[in-house]
From Swiss-Prot:
Binds two Mg(2+) per subunit. The magnesium ions form salt bridges with both the protein and the DNA. Can also accept other divalent metal cations, such as Mn(2+) or Ca(2+). GO terms for biological process: apoptotic chromosome condensation; chromatin organization; chromosome condensation; chromosome segregation; DNA damage response; DNA topological change; embryonic cleavage; female meiosis chromosome separation. It comes from Mus musculus. This is DNA topoisomerase 2-alpha. ATP binds at residues 90, 119, 147-149, 160-167, 375-377. Residues 714-1168 form the Topo IIA-type catalytic domain. Keywords: Acetylation, ATP-binding, Biological rhythms, Cytoplasm, DNA-binding, Isomerase, Isopeptide bond, Magnesium, Metal-binding, Nucleotide-binding, Nucleus, Phosphoprotein, Topoisomerase, Ubl conjugation. Eukaryotic topoisomerase I and II can relax both negative and positive supercoils, whereas prokaryotic enzymes relax only negative supercoils. There is a cross-link at residues 17, 155-156, 351, 385, 396, 415, 417, 424, 439, 465, 479, 528, 583, 598, 613, 621, 624, 631, 638, 654, 661, 675, 1074, 1193, 1201, 1226, 1238, 1272, 1279, 1282, 1359, 1363, 1382, 1418, 1438, 1450, 1455, 1480, 1488 (Glycyl lysine isopeptide (Lys-Gly) (interchain with G-Cter in SUMO2)). Key decatenating enzyme that alters DNA topology by binding to two double-stranded DNA molecules, generating a double-stranded break in one of the strands, passing the intact strand through the broken strand, and religating the broken strand. May play a role in regulating the period length of BMAL1 transcriptional oscillation. Gene3D superfamilies: 3.30.1360.40, 3.30.1490.30, 3.30.230.10, 3.40.50.670, Histidine kinase-like ATPase, C-terminal domain (3.30.565.10), Topoisomerase II, domain 5 (3.90.199.10), Topoisomerase, domain 3 (1.10.268.10). Mg(2+) 2 binds at D540, D542. Mg(2+) 1 binds at E460, D540.
């Protein structure tokens, strides 16, 4: 059909045409729908059975003769590879059927296209199949759908599965020959198939009597694979498979073309892959190998090309892996992920698949009836539960895996990824304008071609920025930019990647300056890529300002060290002090320089002095002056060489903890030596200073911050206070309030009176901490808690707002810190204002009473509380020349027990009793286990259970108050019985450990010192306190003598005036004074005596004092002063006043004579007696307040309300469970002791007999001298100790923590003898006895030299002879509470009763632990007796009064931790009190330590903190903290 040119053509017309043309060629239905035999189907669609028959090119592991096994690109036909592999796997399978099989021979002849595989395993049965009527070899090799693997009930670990393998090889071969021999059937079978199994040859059967074997020989039909011959690539693959079989089939020797393959097993096979492979550092890869069990063998090494695996299932090469590989890899990955996360805290998040990418795993497995995703068997799909075996890798394998380089490789990858992320924060392009940075005042030329001339000023806060902006009015804004810092920047050297990424401050600085990570700024051209050519640091001139400078230097040095060589950093300094007179003004940039000027300027008092605490003190006018004189105020940092790099690393690197300790030690020793020699303090920023090396900055300025950190964090041995606490006490003493005052108001007063320069919130928290008296806080609170100051419910964190609570001095405070001692103290000055003393000198060591805790830089302090009366009794023993008794920690009102495990290691036990078979009662928790915390973290999980642990208890009820604890807990009988077997204290976490291996304190000369025992602290305090009682007596004798002389003169003057011997009316003053001198009157004796105490008038009195005393001073300078006589009122002439004056004179003389008769020891004993008497009164009042409203008390607390109150008391029917100190606990404690001794010996410190090296100076000179009998008190180490974990070397909470084992004992300082003739000088005020001035500068060293002490007595180690009474039962004993007391407490021999007044003895508790109920007063062993006697004396050897006296003198047993005093028991009180039976197992045992504070080795020869040099500003404090006072 023709188409018209105009006729449209459509698709239907074309189709019709085609149909007509093909009509004759239409296929029949039969030809379209065909049925093929299976043989025809296999040949027609081979990819279904053997994979592709087309050539493919891909990366494969092959074996080449010249290079061995290697991974390269090969071109091969997968189908051909598969048919070869089927026959090879069949040969290997025969090993599973016949363990005796030992050899496989593979022959590959590429030229003749012949492949042969022979094995000597058990032959195929040469017997006719009775069903199929054909011989078995012909059946399984020549007929499809035949196999021995069809019985799924039989668990096989062979590669054959579907019955196709060998037949497929036959089908795709032009010739296929089977030859097998069976010794069992005594026949040999041989048959050949040709033409793709289309034609079978004749079967040959021969008799046979040799060893079994099977041999398959075939010639692949290359035409089916579109190949001409067996090329190099396919042969290389086949050879590698021969090696695979050699490695994966145990105890089978494989020959290839007649040659034995050099593979001795799977481990040997793995080495073929790793030949010449090295890691990132050039070392050979480390292989971890484990034969887990007969079915699993695993090797692991590091991979640099992503996850790699070489695996075999029943000799099949699973090139794509499968579930068997995942099963093994997941075990390894889970362990490695944990390790990587620990080592990469805060870094880039690492996921499991990223860890897996660094692993190369080799697995050889035998799996029962494996399944695959295809006939090619490259991926094993069987689920792990069906493997028929398990592969649990050993801890040894995992540990080796962690150390084989994989973890390091992952961490390097993490760093690389982190660097990529950091680089995204940087801009490689220099911008003239940048956006998105608040508070930045950019220089106009920043980012331009003049950018190298621009300077970025980094200021400490917004106020400093304002000062800088004011100064820019002088130098202009084109070249100077300003950016304020929000405090201290991050220590990037130890910060995590996450911290750096999220730190806005650091990212802003990088963006402003135009810095790029990993860029080297070596040459000038690289500097031109920056937006600023310099950074100027402008901070306050205090220690915290120095720290900020150091952190910025560290930031640049860590990331771009080359910038430091270009003088990239500089600082802007401002004055600390300015003095002015008339129009003359002098600025000083360090306090030592100011002191030098004062000493060289005779009339310096006429100059006006102004102190600058920070940049905010300067005015805008002064800012302009500073910037106008840029040469004086700009100090460049100069790089002087590798010593600068070392110094910066020393200050900020976590790895140099020990070096930093030695650095601080040397600094303190050097400062002390300079002070002793009278040398001036070393300082920076003199008048000619224009540059500063980094080394000088670190060693002369930054070190002051580190030292001040310790001063603010570690208390003084003398008064147990930190500076902030001392400021509070100083203010309270000065105010002497008779009425309560709000905490918030007191904090303001403290800031004003003691020159406190920081936020008042931390002061308020300090005040609250000083007033707290709940269990676990203070044993003696110096302030009264009037209001809610916190309770044991929340550990004090439940205190009310400081605006709502009141406080005032405790009645005991001034008895502990007698005003008479104030005149002997050395008061400090701040901003020309006299503030708190260097330390107070209490009558007992308060650091033992209230304990101490703090973390500084390099060292930490932890000391528990001790019982007040035990400490007092030990002081009395020392005063009497006796040895003090060992003391156990003790906490006021704690009803549990504390036992010693080992030296300085204790276990603290709560109280638990059994009420019935399903109920227990917890009536006390370990110290500092707060009630609410215990409920939430212990009882709630026990009640509700967790995913891993089922619930243990069925219910609990709470009956506690703010001061007592009572949980009543319900359990099933079975679980209670099991808990009893394990130990109720252990199950319910009612035991905690306490370790005191870090008793580090500042001694009286301001040196850090480590004490080995609490008795060492007590002895040091005793020597110092006794000396100061001598000084007090000397001062009182002088003062009383002067006052007596004054009264005597006044009385004589009045009498002579009355008698008319002296006429003063209408006489000139000079003549009158002359008359008084002639008649023998003394110039004001009191004033003269005070002036005599000062060789030089106090140069540091504040201006108010100067003003007030100017008149009297001028009068004094003119000659004698008789104002004390001439200023007396006229009414002193009356008879009454005259008689009173004479009486006062006589009384004063009597007082003086009485004082002369007393020794310093007598004065001390008097103070102790008065203190104890008042303590009894205070405690009685506290007890009375606690008992208000309790049952059985008088008043309204009866009936229903009384019954409710009874619920809070422990149940009288409970059977107390005695806490057990297990063998494991003691063993652990002893282990720690041995480790400590071992580490000490390793460090070179002798451990025998307490003999130790000499002083610090001797150690420096390497003279290891022994000092027999010296007290063992360790000092700052010069040898490194083991390092501890620390995130930030400058952080209070994490500073330089070392492990317990690294304590190093260093000897005590050699004491310097004081001259006996040196007369003590006292701090006095010329106008009143109530205000005190500082000591004379020249006498300062003399007064605070080491004490002139007699040779120390041989140290008696505390003996652990306080035996626990034996109890029945294994790990937990339950005893009747009544009989516990009656039967278990022996009497102890009496001792003299001289320490306490007899009338107070009756009310003392006879046992240290408030245990369970007692019905009668029994004589009980004291802690002192238990500590020194091996056996108690027989009962009844002493009378009650003697026993009472004995108990008063000696410490009570370890169990009664500061229990409330009990009067002799009566029926009323015993019914209502908590059951008081004493724990049989709770006297002294040796204890296991709690988490480690820094082991610290401190030198007692360290110089005290000099209070001159740069003005100190303490670090910023946390607003809410239990240990807020730790931060001062």
């Amino acid at each position: 059909m023709e188409l018209s040119p105009l006729q449209p053509v459509n698709e239907n017309m074309l189709m019709n045409k085609k149909k007509n043309e093909d009509g004759k060629k239409r296929l029949s239905i039969e030809r379209i729908y065909q049925k093929k035999t299976q043989l025809e189907h296999i040949l027609l669609r081979p990819d279904t059975y053997i994979g592709s028959v087309e050539l493919v090119t891909q990366q494969m592991w092959v074996y080449d003769e010249d290079v061995g096994i290697n991974y390269r690109e090969v071109t091969f036909v997968p189908g051909l590879y598969k048919i070869f592999d089927e026959i090879l796997v069949n040969a290997a399978d025969n090993k599973q059927r016949d363990p005796k099989m030992s050899c496989i021979r593979v022959t590959i002849d590429p030229e003749n296209n012949v492949i042969s595989i022979w094995n000597n395993g058990k032959g195929i049965p040469v017997v006719e199949h009775k069903v199929e009527k054909i011989y078995v070899p012909a059946l399984i090799f020549g007929q499809l759908l035949t196999s021995s693997n069809y019985d799924d009930d039989e668990k096989k670990v062979t590669g054959g599965r579907n019955g196709y393998g060998a037949k497929l090889c036959n089908i795709f071969s032009t010739k296929f020959t089977v030859e097998t021999a069976s010794r069992e059937y005594k026949k040999m079978f041989k048959q050949t198939w040709m033409d793709n199994m289309g034609r079978a040859g004749d079967m040959e059967l021969k008799p046979f009597s040799g060893e079994d074997y099977t041999c398959i020989t075939f010639q692949p039909d290359l035409s089916k694979f579109k190949m001409q011959s067996l090329d190099k690539d396919i042969v290389a693959l086949m050879v590698r498979r021969a090696y695979d079989i050699a490695g994966s089939t145990k105890d089978v020797k494989v020959f290839l073309n007649g040659n034995s393959l050099p593979v001795k097993g799977f481990r040997s096979y793995v080495d073929l892959y790793l030949k010449d492979k090295v890691d990132e550092t050039g070392n050979s890869l480390k292989v971890i190998h484990e034969q887990v069990n007969p079915r699993w063998e695993v090797c692991l090494t590091m991979s640099e090309r992503g996850f790699q695996q070489i695996s075999f299932v029943n000799s099949i090469a699973t090139s794509k892996g499968g579930r068997h590989v995942d099963y093994v890899a997941d075990q390894i990955v889970s362990k490695l992920v944990d390790v990587v996360k620990k080592k990469n805290k805060g870094g880039v998040a690492v996921k499991a698949h990223q860890v897996k990418n660094h692993m190369w795993i080799f697995v050889n497995a035998l799996i029962e009836n494996p399944t695959f995703d295809s006939q090619t068997k490259e991926n094993m799909t069987l689920q792990a539960k069906s493997f028929g075996s398990t592969c649990q890798l050993s801890e040894k394998f995992i540990k080796a895996a962690i150390g084989c380089g994989i973890v390091e490789s992952i961490l390097n990858w993490v760093k690389f990824k982190a660097q990529i992320q950091l680089n995204k924060k940087c801009s490689a392009v220099k911008h003239t304008k940048i956006k998105g940075i608040p508070k930045l005042d950019d220089a106009n030329d920043a980012g331009s071609r003049n950018s190298t001339e621009c300077t970025l000023i980094l200021t400490e806060g917004d106020s400093a920025k304002t000062l800088a902006v004011s100064g820019l009015g002088v130098v202009g804004r084109d070249k100077y930019g300003v950016f304020p810092l929000r405090g201290k920047i991050l220590n990037v050297r130890e910060a995590s990647h996450k911290q750096i990424m999220e730190n806005a401050e650091i990212n802003n600085i990088i963006k402003i300056v135009g810095l790029q990570y990993k860029k080297n700024y070596e040459d000038e051209d690289s500097l031109k890529t920056l937006r600023y050519g310099k950074i100027m640091i402008m901070t306050d001139q205090d220690q915290d300002g120095s720290h900020i400078k150091g952190l910025l230097i560290n930031f640049i040095h860590h990331n771009w060290p080359s910038l430091l060589r270009h003088r990239f950093l500089e600082e802007f300094i401002t004055p600390i002090v300015k003095v002015s007179k008339n129009k003359q003004e002098i600025a000083f940039y360090s306090l030592p320089e100011f002191e030098e000027w004062k000493s060289s300027t005779p009339n310096h008092k006429k100059w006006k002095v102004k102190y600058y605490k920070g940049l905010g003190t300067s005015t805008s006018k002064e800012a302009k002056e500073y910037f106008a004189d840029m040469k004086r105020h700009r100090i460049q940092f100069k790089y002087s060489g590798p010593e600068d790099d070392a110094a910066i690393s020393l200050a900020f690197s976590k790895k140099q903890v020990d070096d930093r300790k030695e650095w601080l030690t040397n600094f303190m020793e050097d400062r002390r030596q300079r002070k002793l020699l009278g040398l001036p303090e070393d300082y920076l920023y003199g008048q000619s200073t224009s540059y500063l090396t980094y080394n000088d900055f670190i060693n002369k300025e930054l070190i002051l911050f580190s030292n001040s950190d310790n001063e603010r964090s570690i208390p003084s041995m003398v008064d147990g206070l930190k500076p902030g606490q001392r400021k509070v006490l100083f203010t309270c003493f000065k105010r002497n309030d008779k009425r309560e005052v709000k905490v918030a108001q007191l904090a303001g007063s403290v800031a004003e009176m003691s020159s406190y320069h920081h936020g008042e919130m931390s002061l308020m928290m300090t005040i609250i901490n000083l007033a707290q008296n709940f269990v676990g806080s203070n044993n003696l609170n110096l302030l009264q808690p009037i209001g809610q100051f916190g309770t044991r419910l929340h550990g004090g964190k439940d205190s009310a707002s400081p605006r709502y609570i009141f406080t005032m001095l405790s009645p005991l405070a001034r008895l502990l810190f007698p005003p008479k001692d104030d005149h002997t103290l050395r008061f400090l000055y701040d901003d020309n204002q006299r503030v708190e003393p260097e330390w107070y000198i209490p009558i007992i060591p308060m650091v033992l009473i209230n304990g101490a805790e703090g973390i500084g830089t390099g060292w930490s302090c932890k000391i528990p509380n001790f019982d007040v009366r035990e400490v007092v009794n030990n002081i009395r023993r020392l005063l009497d020349g006796e040895e003090p008794l060992p003391m156990l920690p003790s906490y006021k009102n704690f009803k549990g027990t504390i036992e010693e495990l080992a030296s300085n290691q204790y276990v603290i036990n709560g109280e638990v009793a059994i009420l019935d078979s399903t109920t227990i009662e917890i009536s006390e928790l370990p110290i500092r286990t707060w009630t609410q915390t215990y409920k939430e973290q212990v009882l709630e999980p026990m009640l509700n259970g967790t995913e891993k642990t089922p619930s243990l208890i069925t219910d609990y009820r709470e009956y506690h108050t703010d001061t007592t604890v009572k949980f009543v807990i319900k359990m099933t009988e079975e679980k209670l019985a099991e808990a009893e077997r394990v130990g109720l204290h252990k199950v319910f976490k009612l035991q905690s450990s306490l370790t005191c291996n870090s008793m580090v304190l500042f001694d009286h000369v301001g040196c850090l010192k480590k004490y080995d025992t609490v008795l060492d602290i007590l002895r040091d305090f005793f020597e110092l306190r006794l000396k100061y009682y001598g000084l007090r007596k000397e001062w009182l004798l002088g003062m009383l003598g002067a006052e007596s002389s004054k009264l005597n003169n006044q009385a004589r003057f009045i009498l002579e005036k009355i008698d008319g011997k002296i006429v003063i009316e209408n006489k000139p003053k000079k003549e009158l004074i002359k008359v008084l001198i002639q008649r023998g009157y003394d110039s004001d004796p009191v004033k003269a005596w005070k002036e005599a105490q000062q060789k030089v008038p106090d140069e540091e009195e504040n201006e108010e004092s100067d003003t007030e005393t100017s008149t009297s001073d001028s009068a004094a300078e003119a000659g004698p002063t008789f104002n004390y006589l001439l200023d007396m009122p006229l009414w002193y002439l009356t008879k009454e006043k005259k008689d009173e004056l004479c009486k006062q004179r006589n009384e004063k003389e009597q007082e003086l004579n009485t004082l002369k008769q007393k020794s310093p020891s007598d004065l001390w004993k008097e103070d102790l007696a008065v203190f104890i008497e008042e303590l009894e009164v205070v405690e009685a009042k506290e007890k009375q307040d606690e008992q208000v409203g309790l049952p059985g008390k008088a008043g309204k607390a009866k009936g229903k309300k009384a019954q409710m109150c009874a619920d809070v008391l422990p149940s009288p029917r409970g059977k107390r469970v005695i806490p057990q100190v297990t063998v494991e606990m003691k063993a652990e404690a002893e282990k720690k002791i041995r480790k400590k001794i071992k580490s000490e010996n390793v460090e070179g410190t002798p451990a025998e007999d307490g003999a130790e090296p000499g002083s610090l100076r001797q150690r420096i000179e390497k003279k290891q001298k022994k000092e027999p009998g010296a007290k063992k008190q360790t000092t700052l180490p010069f040898k490194p100790v083991k390092k501890g974990r620390k995130k930030n070397p400058w952080s209070d909470s994490e500073s330089d923590v070392s492990s317990n084992e690294s304590n190093v004992d260093v000897p005590p300082r050699q004491k310097e003898q004081r001259s006996a003739a040196a007369k003590a000088k006292f701090t006095v005020d010329l106008d009143s006895d109530e205000d005190f001035s500082g000591l004379d500068e020249k006498d300062e060293d003399e007064d605070f030299l080491p004490l002139d002490a007699t040779p120390p007595k041989a140290k008696i180690p505390p003996k652990n002879t306080k035996k626990a009474l034996k109890t029945q039962g294994s790990s937990m004993s339950v005893v009747d509470l009544e009989s516990d007391v009656k039967d278990s407490v022996p009497a102890s021999p009496g001792v003299p009763a001289a320490d306490f007044p007899a009338e107070t003895e009756q009310s003392k508790p006879s046992k240290k632990t408030v245990g369970v109920k007692k019905t009668a007063t029994k004589s009980q062993s004291s802690v002192s007796t238990a500590g020194t006697k091996k056996r108690a004396a027989p009962k009844g050897t002493k009378s009650d009064s003697a026993l009472s006296a004995r108990v008063s003198e000696k410490p009570a047993p370890a169990k009664a931790k500061n229990s409330r005093k009990r009067k002799p028991s009566s029926s009323d009180s015993s019914d209502s009190d908590f059951e008081r039976a004493i724990s049989k197992g709770a006297t002294s045992k040796k204890a296991k330590g709690e988490e480690q504070d820094f082991p610290v080795d401190l030198e007692d020869t360290i110089a005290p903190r000099a209070k001159s040099d740069r003005a100190r500003k303490p670090i910023k404090y946390l607003e809410e903290s239990d240990d807020d006072d730790d931060l001062f």
